[in-house]
A protein has these predicted regions:
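DUTPase catalytic domain/fold
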Residues: 1-147
Length: 147
């Protein structure tokens, strides 16, 4: 599949896979000034790009493991979803779970984007609970299999 990318910020690099078999495309911050994120706080960070996904695909925005491990930085609405019909700037909602302020600098790799196929369900209402498919688990919820 082809991912079309339009650079809103011509100075920043295109997003890219950082290894031959990486599933995530690294996204870069596109900020004029450094952005500080205090512990427990979050900020929307622009990437300076918009994307054109083919119909039947989505892009999921996910945290970078190195930022999570070293600084407690994550994508707050992880995974963030970019629908195939969205053409605005890709922005990442970063959250600081760390103990120190975290500074986002221009062109810093801040998140990764994974492209996935989308299956759209046909939604059918049933009249009675007994019309639902039965399973061994049935309605067992949180913690029903133990800790």
């Amino acid at each position: 599949m082809i991912l079309k990318v339009y650079k809103l910020n011509k100075n920043n690099p295109l997003p890219d896979y950082m290894s031959h078999q990486a599933s995530g495309i690294d996204l870069f911050a596109s900020v004029e000034n450094d952005v500080s994120i205090a512990p427990g706080d979050y900020r929307i960070i622009p990437t300076g790009i918009s994307v054109s996904l083919p119909q039947g695909y989505e892009a999921q925005l996910r945290p970078r493991s190195g930022l999570a491990l070293k600084h407690g930085i994550t994508v707050l609405n992880s995974p963030g979803t970019i629908d195939a019909d969205y053409r605005g700037e890709v922005k990442v909602l970063l959250m600081n779970h760390g103990k120190k302020p975290f500074v986002v600098k221009n062109m810093m790799r801040i998140a990764q984007m994974v492209i996935s196929e989308v299956v759209r369900a046909r939604i059918i209402e049933v009249d009675e609970e007994k019309q639902m498919d039965k399973t061994k688990r049935d309605n067992g919820g949180f913690g029903h299999t133990g800790v």
